[in-house]
Amino acid sequence: MSWDQVWIDINIATMSPNISEPYGAIRDAALAVKDGKIAWIGKRCDLPEFDVLATPIYKGKNGWLTPGLIDAHTHLVFAGNRANEFELRLQGASYEEIARNGGGIISTVNACREADEAELFELGRQRLNALAKEGVTTVEIKSGYGLDIETELKILRVARELGKHHHVDVKTTFLGAHAIPPEYKNDSDAYVDLVINEMLPQVIAENLADAVDVFCENIAFSLAQTERVLTAAKNAGLDIKLHAEQLSNLGGSEMAAKLGAKSVDHIEYLDEDGVKALSESGTCATLLPGAFYFLRETQLPPIELLRQYKVPMVVASDYNPGSSPLCSSLLMLNMACTLMRLTPEEALAGMTRNAAKALGIEAEVGVLETGMTADFCLWNISTPAELSYTYGVGSCIEVVKNGRLVHQ
């Protein structure tokens, strides 16, 4: 056998549903890489003969390999911060009250409109580095802090550039319908027209987005407006997803599922009809425990119903300056378990296999199987549950991305 690298003295949490063991585990395992792909994986005792003198061999010291982590929902490119709003919330103001008084998303919009691409790139690079240190190898980045053509395109260009200059893969999402800008305060339909007829065509022309998202909520866009944007995006050949049922139940998840959305995100107020719709369409349910925690919410997503109907649950950071300024995917694993009562295995699946499905890249990454991209992390842990159980100990030792070793 001729391989580019071989990993031994490891255990592997493949996260493959085809292996009955928890985490799809293979103990005392080995893994071989060739041309950026996993060429062989299995028990070490079954490892075929290969040229040990010509092949780099990496010893994992009985640690665990997992798929590279995938953060499938972030707003990572932004300027400014909203620490003052944090203080207001602790004094009793609600997220909705702050938004209705010109704070919230709009304050970040103003900062992003003033920032240039170089500033946004450097801020984004620092945040991407922080996630990468925790084993994240793929990140989704949304726009939505421009709310005008120039700034929305600027944010998406920066996100694309980050993907070109960093080992972390970046998937971009156009979220022009994130909030109603002040200049359209009294005519939100006209702003929706702008998103559909002017912003979206330019985003497509520059190939700046892999998907389109909308914030469907009483303080943002109505169900009818949301459907218009998602339908236009779908007709243009883009994937669609939705911020839905975070503060109330408008039926956005059902509508998005019928349109074939990859995911619906937040979903604290999702009901059983909505869960059924997700199950029937194969749409993922993205849980955002950081926002749930930071906003001190009490309405939990319907975890038991999602289990009952076998809806793939995704766990993501929702990293943003207002409702989840928490740039840590490992912290999200812990919060998903402690706050939302996921099992550690469900949480890890939510940042690997299911997160890949939510981004439409499940044929490439998210599980460790022969033929998949060699995209994995080595952790200094004795069981995969430690990734959710403990936090802050720096247990990610090495990362391999596209078959290339990325030194920590």
Swiss-Prot record:
Keyword vocabulary terms for this entry: Cytoplasm, Histidine metabolism, Hydrolase, Iron, Metal-binding, Zinc
Signal sequence, renumbered to the chain: none
Entries under CDD domains matching the protein: Imidazolone-5PH
GO biological process terms, semicolon-separated: L-histidine catabolic process to glutamate and formamide; L-histidine catabolic process to glutamate and formate
Cofactor binding note of this UniProt entry: Binds 1 zinc or iron ion per subunit.
Catalytic activity reported: 4-imidazolone-5-propanoate + H2O = N-formimidoyl-L-glutamate
Positions that bind 4-imidazolone-5-propanoate: R82, Y145, H178, Q246, S323
Full protein name: Imidazolonepropionase
The gene coding this protein: hutI
